[in-house]
């Protein structure tokens, strides 16, 4: 197996998935290609290759490109089971870090539950203060308080860390989804206490839904003080989101009104907006 990875190999593995190396634009506000006032200041790395945005809440310097960890390369084990190729994953993360990426986004449900552990093993080789981890409370099948707390604690174990930089309520569409998975169980009280204790550095949610659903969640900001929100934003979704989904322009403007910074998912629309040339 190759012991190094070049830019073309990296883009073929990562860029085509549109969740790796460009799947998350971290802590950024965007308006038609311009940086919004809520996005914080920008600065270049020493080599000028990566731009960083400042988290206005705590001063984190976050790379404008993050690494989505939903599509790590897979191989078969001796029993024919699909498992993450840890060696290649390590090399991909090494390449990303070498080129200034410091934000890594995963979730308990990614890759049949394998993503967090593989990501944690790779990142453990680096100083903890040199990168930011984002993961999610993906309590879709069992939203009980006990299960939600265990999922959160299991994320800490899998990621081999004692705190999470950016923690998201996974895939909210509005108040009904929020109440059924988070509002009624008491988990929000627990998560707020974890934030106060520093084990969650930033608390927010990822969103897929209508403008009305987003308005409902924005109405909760005074109570829960969202530190950030993850939205899908690209040049198609900016004003032509599919179905009943809210346009990204509307979502970003509503966040800007409240001074909430955004993290971007799907800037390449699952790879459909980008092709890696063969030459």
Give the location of each predicted region.
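Beta/alpha (TIM)-barrel catalytic core signal, keyed to glycine-rich beta->alpha loops juxtaposed to Asp/Glu
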Residues: 172-279
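Structural preference for beta-strand elements that scaffold enzyme active sites
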Residues: 62-66, 103, 130-134, 163-166, ...
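Short, acidic/polar
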Residues: 82-95, 144-158, 212-219
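Structural motif corresponding to the early beta-alpha repeats
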Residues: 126-145, 149, 170-171
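Short helix-capping segments at alpha-helix termini
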Residues: 124-131, 159-160, 195-200, 223-225
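Active-site groove signature of glycoside hydrolases
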Residues: 159-177
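N-terminal binding-site loop/beta-alpha segment at the start of enzyme catalytic domains
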Residues: 2-131, 190
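Generic structural signal for well-ordered alpha-helices
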Residues: 52, 93, 116, 120, ...
């Amino acid at each position: 197996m190759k012991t190094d990875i070049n830019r073309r190999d990296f883009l073929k593995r990562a860029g085509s998935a549109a969740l790796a190396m460009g799947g998350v634009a971290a802590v950024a506000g965007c308006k038609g290609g311009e940086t919004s006032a809520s996005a914080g200041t920008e600065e270049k790395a020493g080599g000028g290759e990566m731009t960083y945005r400042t988290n206005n809440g705590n001063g984190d310097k976050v790379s404008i490109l993050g690494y989505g960890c939903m599509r790590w390369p897979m191989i078969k084990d001796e029993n024919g089971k699909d498992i993450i190729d840890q060696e290649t994953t390590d090399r991909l993360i090494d390449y990303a870090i070498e080129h200034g990426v410091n934000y890594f986004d995963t979730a308990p449900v990614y890759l049949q539950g394998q993503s967090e552990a593989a990501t944690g093993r790779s990142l453990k080789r680096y100083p903890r203060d040199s990168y930011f981890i984002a993961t999610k409370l993906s309590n879709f099948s069992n939203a009980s308080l006990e299960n939600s707390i265990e999922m959160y604690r299991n994320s800490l174990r899998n990621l081999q860390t004692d705190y999470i930089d950016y923690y998201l309520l996974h895939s909210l569409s509005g108040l009904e989804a929020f109440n059924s998975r988070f509002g009624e169980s008491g988990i929000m009280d627990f998560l707020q206490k974890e934030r106060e204790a520093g084990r969650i550095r930033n608390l927010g949610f990822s969103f897929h839904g209508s403008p009305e659903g987003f308005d409902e969640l924005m109405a909760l900001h005074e109570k829960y003080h969202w530190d950030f929100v993850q939205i899908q934003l690209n040049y198609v979704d900016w004003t032509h989101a599919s179905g009943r989904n809210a346009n990204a322009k509307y979502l970003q403007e509503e966040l800007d009104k409240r001074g909430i910074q955004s993290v971007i998912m799907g800037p390449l629309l699952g790879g459909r907006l980008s092709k890696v040339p063969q030459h």
